[in-house]
């Protein structure tokens, strides 16, 4: 079940490393955690490395608490929940979702996106 609506979500202190406004990150976390059962949220890729360019998108990984639905459905719901916010902020994005157990299994395999998330990602929630 999605979490109940909240306001003033606290984002992790590591999120201050990102060049994304805190208000955008907080609203993104609120929207995603309201849409899907969320364990954690990471930003990875060029924004996490602080190498973003004007054409860069924000890469987001949502780790879910539950495997009640397929990851694609969780990703779709999470993506729909932040679409307007990201558009209004002028940010393109890619969003992936993983079940927690699948992420934990894959994050040590250097050929997976999960490995990149684990090694360069910035946890903004969870």
Feature-to-residue mapping (PLM):
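Conserved H-loop
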Residues: 46
């Amino acid at each position: 079940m999605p979490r109940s609506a909240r306001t003033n979500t606290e984002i992790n202190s590591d999120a201050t490393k990102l060049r994304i406004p805190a208000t955008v990150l907080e609203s993104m976390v609120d929207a995603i955690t309201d849409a899907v059962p969320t364990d954690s949220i990471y930003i990875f890729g060029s924004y996490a490395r602080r190498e973003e360019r004007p054409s860069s998108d924000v890469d987001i990984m949502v780790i879910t608490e539950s495997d009640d639905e397929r990851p694609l459905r969780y990703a779709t719901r999470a993506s729909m929940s932040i679409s307007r916010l990201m558009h209004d902020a002028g940010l393109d994005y890619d969003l992936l979702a993983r079940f927690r157990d699948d992420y934990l299994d894959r994050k040590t395999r250097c050929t997976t996106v999960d490995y990149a998330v684990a090694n360069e990602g910035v946890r903004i929630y969870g």
